[in-house]
Amino acid sequence: MAGHSKWANIKHKKAAADAKRGKIWTRLIKEIQVAARLGGGDVNSNPRLRLAVDKAADANMPKDNVKRAIDRGVGGADGANYEEIRYEGYGIGGAAIIVDTLTDNRTRTVAEVRHAFSKFGGNMGTDGSVAFMFDHVGQFLFAPGTSEDALMEAALEAGANDVNTNDDGSIEVLCDWQEFSKVKDALEAAGFKAELAEVTMKPQNEVDFTGEDAVKMQKLLDALENLDDVQEVYTNAVVVEE
């Protein structure tokens, strides 16, 4: 058994995403454009594009929007030339935070990210200052009540590296990030549909925040996630709701 209330955390995350669907779509369109520009418009030969298109489907984005984003990326149209920049920093108590961005203006983005860190009690670090505390992996989360034995057998056969049952009964499956699409397809073919399936930066160790510290940490994370140029925010902080 391992982990905190992963199920509660993911339900909260999904609810927040639903509330910001327009913003989620904007981020996905940027990611689809960049993936298509870098690797071509065929999802079968471009794993990054396929992942972005799958996320768009999960977010109920219309297929026409997806196609237009792919076409813009492949065609190199205005707006497709975003630069990928990763920022690293610390929240209160030294919590590790990674901020991945896609931007057409590096100066604007770094200023906005730095301002969010400083306004809410954190500070930016140098490249590599916290990334070593995370693993780049494919992650799947299955609802409590899923058959652990059957899922473990299917996951390991699919090429997963690890299967963990959390304290709340949810089950987490981890794989190499390069194998994400293959493992996802195999699990779904075996009848297992994950509530969460993503390529992520998973913290090697987590730090709980409660009370006032939890409120402060959540404000910092929200401020970063609400920046237009930010695509993903990863942290080893766990905000515990009381």
Swiss-Prot record:
GO molecular function (one): DNA binding
Family (UniProt): Belongs to the TACO1 family.
The organism of origin for this protein: Burkholderia mallei (strain ATCC 23344)
GO CC terms: cytosol
InterPro entries membership: Integrase-like_N, TACO1_YebC-like_2nd/3rd_dom, TACO1_YebC_N, Transcrip_reg_TACO1-like, Transcrip_reg_TACO1-like_dom3, YebC-like
PANTHER family: TRANSCRIPTIONAL REGULATORY PROTEIN YEBC-RELATED, TRANSLATIONAL ACTIVATOR OF CYTOCHROME C OXIDASE 1
GO biological process terms, semicolon-separated: regulation of DNA-templated transcription
Name by which UniProt lists this protein: Probable transcriptional regulatory protein BMA1884
